[in-house]
Amino acid sequence: MPDIQLRFHRDMLVLSSPIAPVLARQGFELDGDVEYATLMEPEAVEDALRLNLMAGVQCLVTETAGMTPARLAHRGMAERLPELARAAVSCAAKLRPQHVLVELGPCGLPLDASSKASLNENRDQYARAARAFEGLSLDGFFLNGFSSPSDLKCALMGLRQVSGLPVFASVNVGVDGMLADGRHGFDEALDGMAEFEASVAGFCTQAPVERACELARQAAKLPLPVLAQLDVVEHNPR
């Protein structure tokens, strides 16, 4: 596959949208069934990803946000992490997209930013997840859905222990510029992205477009490409 980094600051790259809603309409439960579908019904996952390709996206994002050891252990699937990783990347690679990104979300473990043991435990979650994808055909990792700078820092450190691939990092930001945890600002997350070697600085917001553009300009102060995600809330006046 082409080196995605050669396209940074040159091309506008569009990432695929989450396929979980598509799978949910087919009867899959979002909590656990997505991993099941990846293994047992890969055709359903491939069909959902194919819809994104038909829409013209350049980057297919694997349905792997919940594939950290702690989250898989909660579903009794921790030992199947390597198998799940291979299946997820295979589903995307079969469609021959321009690029494949592996998504990892927050690991879900409690995090005490003042405790070295807690930080190491969280960091290890992401390192172990990244190791499961070693040797597979991917162009980078996508750290998505993070709500605190400390959690994001652990994720970045964990990935950098294992991989030199590009890392897209994204945090959830409110209209007021605060992260979803309500205690830290977007600027703190950007500082962490710069310090811990993110390749792309990103955010996801439900804010109006004008406010989202302000967040994008804030992120653009870093010497990194900017990833903007708009979380469009369903409008049902009834």
Q: Where is each model-derived feature located?
A:
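Domain-level signal for soluble alpha/beta catalytic cores
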Residues: M1-R238
